[in-house]
């Protein structure tokens, strides 16, 4: 089909990555009967925006792969919940109680929130709730379950058998100091239940056991099977790929230097290494890496307080190979660009559609946007009207789009509520109004005069055209309720008052009337906010009543 042909050539990055997966498989379905796309989750903290990004992007590649290959696939979310708790995360209650459980597997640490059997189980539940909220289709696998149920026994026994080979790979990557005590096996102490980082005294290939000194110095021998022992994280990666026959895994740039290690170990343990894809990490507004336990940057819940999950998926689609700052200012832009792309999609040919982010966000099943007003404009409305509720916002929306309603435009309705919230939390605290300069004051007076009388408005536009040496424009149908006509007036006033750069005039409008340094097309804003209301706003700005 045309779609299939275009997908095979498409330059969109999910198709690029999907073609690599297909090439690795030499176009053949694996013996297990499906192609496995894996994402990993370290449940030391709550799922964060990076977790979402990884799963969302993997799902985009998985979908692109299905389109080009027609093969069945599976998305697995694998939680490393047998890892020892290295430190108590700063963002959980009952910190003191948690201190007693350091180094114990996360699934053996009590849940500080008191809702689950363990801290690991709590964070796993958060992950699943989180993935379910976004409608991801995935299978959840738990490391604890895989180790303790014996599902990893075969690969663990093979690791004992290939111990020297795996150690050789690992030691080459370690500093001398670390080499002395390093072991690929981490026994779980039968006495304290802690995950131990201790050197091996012996590794017995015949009976699949390891011998080491426990924390109290007692020589101890354990079978590597049944969850007595886990693998260090680098060998663990390779072993998991081998045990599950993983075909694709993406991860953050911080892992990229270790990939060849994971791959080698996977091969030593008897399976081909998967396809990989690296993405750059997210930074907070200060350019620092976002971390789970620190909780800096924008959390998922915070994003969803001010915008839809689709806008977040849109943000994740953009240039995965570039480090992106994740802070609150990016939200309005992501929302508006997402809706621009939705509108564009339904007019595009197949090639352009496959290149459109919304194709990948919605797996080809792209909805129609009902956002009749951009989010940035809603924010300015909320700002200038000090709207406290969604209903107040609808009063303005209906001036502009009389047929729109919360029932027929549910996305718009949500956005109106988001705008009120975003305004209160981010715009209001940072609003700074200023007095106009003499030039700006005169121009604002003229703008108000043009809004009062349509004849005055027309004569201002005529004057601008005359001064610019342009032919007069036919203004018979000129209307003060049309956003474009109002924009012509704002433009003409700026020109007539000799603003060298019209951006300075628009900036003055925003700073004096809205208390912000940038804003929407002001003509569109007037048509939404109302002509009389805008005249009143200009007068308040001229009288200094807006200055806090």
Where are these regions (language model features)?
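Secondary-structure transition/capping motifs at alpha-helix termini
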Residues: 66-71, 267-274, 500-501, 548
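Catalytic adenosine-cofactor/nucleotide-binding cores of aminoacyl-tRNA synthetases and other
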Residues: 254, 259, 280-418, 514-548
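Residue-level signal for inorganic ion chemistry
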Residues: 48, 159, 308, 509
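A glycine-rich helix N-cap at a beta->alpha junction
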Residues: 95-130, 134
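N-terminal catalytic cores of NTP/NDP-binding nucleotidyl/phosphoryl-transfer enzymes
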Residues: 2-93, 236-258
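Basic, alpha-helical terminal appendages of large translation-related enzymes
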Residues: 1-34, 47, 72-76, 167, ...
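Charged, often glycine-rich, active-site loop that binds/positions anionic groups
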Residues: 82-99, 155-156, 160, 289, ...
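Active-site cores that bind ATP or allylic diphosphates and position pyrophosphate for catalysis
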Residues: 136-294, 300, 468
């Amino acid at each position: 089909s045309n779609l299939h042909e275009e997908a095979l050539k498409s330059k969109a990055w999910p198709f690029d990555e999907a073609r690599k997966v297909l090439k690795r498989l030499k176009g053949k379905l694996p013996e297990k009967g499906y192609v496995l796309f894996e994402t990993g989750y370290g449940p030391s903290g709550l799922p964060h925006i990076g977790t979402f990004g990884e799963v969302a992007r993997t799902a985009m590649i998985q979908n692109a792969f299905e389109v080009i290959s027609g093969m069945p696939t599976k998305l697995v979310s694998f939680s490393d919940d047998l890892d020892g708790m290295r430190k108590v995360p700063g963002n959980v209650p009952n910190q003191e109680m948690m201190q007693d459980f350091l180094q114990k597997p996360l699934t053996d640490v009590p849940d500080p929130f008191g809702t689950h059997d363990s801290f690991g189980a709590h964070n796993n539940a958060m992950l699943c709730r989180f993935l379910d909220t976004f409608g991801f289709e995935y299978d959840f696998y738990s490391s604890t379950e895989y180790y303790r149920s014996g599902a990893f026994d075969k690969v663990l026994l093979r690791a004992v058998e290939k111990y020297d080979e795996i150690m050789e790979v690992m030691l080459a990557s370690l500093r001398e100091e670390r080499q002395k005590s390093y072991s690929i096996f981490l026994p779980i102490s039968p006495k304290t239940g802690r995950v131990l980082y201790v050197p091996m005294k012996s590794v017995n290939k015949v009976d699949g056991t390891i011998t080491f000194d426990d924390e109290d110095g007692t020589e101890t021998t354990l079978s590597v099977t049944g969850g007595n022992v886990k693998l260090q994280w680098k060998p663990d990666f390779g072993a998991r790929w081998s045990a599950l026959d993983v075909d694709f895994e993406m991860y953050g740039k911080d892992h990229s230097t270790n990939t060849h290690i994971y791959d080698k170990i996977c091969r030593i343990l008897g399976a081909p290494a998967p396809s990989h894809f690296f993405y750059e990490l997210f930074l907070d507004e200060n350019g620092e890496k976002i971390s789970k336990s620190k909780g800096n940057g924008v959390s998922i819940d915070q994003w969803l307080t001010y915008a839809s999950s689709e806008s977040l998926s849109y943000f994740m689609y953009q240039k995965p190979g570039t480090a992106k700052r994740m802070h609150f200012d990016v939200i309005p832009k992501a929302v508006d660009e997402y809706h621009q792309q939705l509108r564009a999609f339904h007019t595009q040919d197949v090639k352009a559609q496959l290149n459109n982010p919304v194709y990948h966000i919605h797996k080809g099943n792209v909805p129609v946007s009902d956002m009749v007003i951009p989010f940035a404009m809603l924010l300015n409305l909320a700002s200038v009207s000090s709207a406290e509720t969604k209903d107040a916002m609808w009063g303005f929306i209906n001036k502009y789009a009389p047929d729109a309603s919360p029932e027929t435009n549910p996305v718009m309705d949500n956005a109106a509520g988001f705008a009120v919230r975003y305004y209160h939390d981010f715009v209001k605290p940072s609003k700074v109004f200023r007095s106009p300069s003499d030039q700006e004051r005169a121009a604002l007076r003229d703008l108000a005069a043009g809004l009062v009388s349509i004849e005055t408005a027309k004569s201002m536009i005529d004057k601008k055209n005359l001064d610019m040496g342009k032919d007069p424009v036919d203004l018979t149908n000129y209307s003060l309720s049309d956003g474009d006509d109002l924009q012509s007036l704002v433009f003409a006033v700026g020109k007539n008052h000799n603003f060298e750069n019209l951006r300075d005039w628009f900036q003055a409008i925003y700073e004096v009337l809205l208390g912000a340094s940038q804003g929407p097309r002001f003509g569109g804003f007037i048509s939404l906010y109302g002509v009389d209301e805008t005249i009143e706003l200009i007068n308040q700005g001229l009288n200094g009543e807006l200055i806090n």
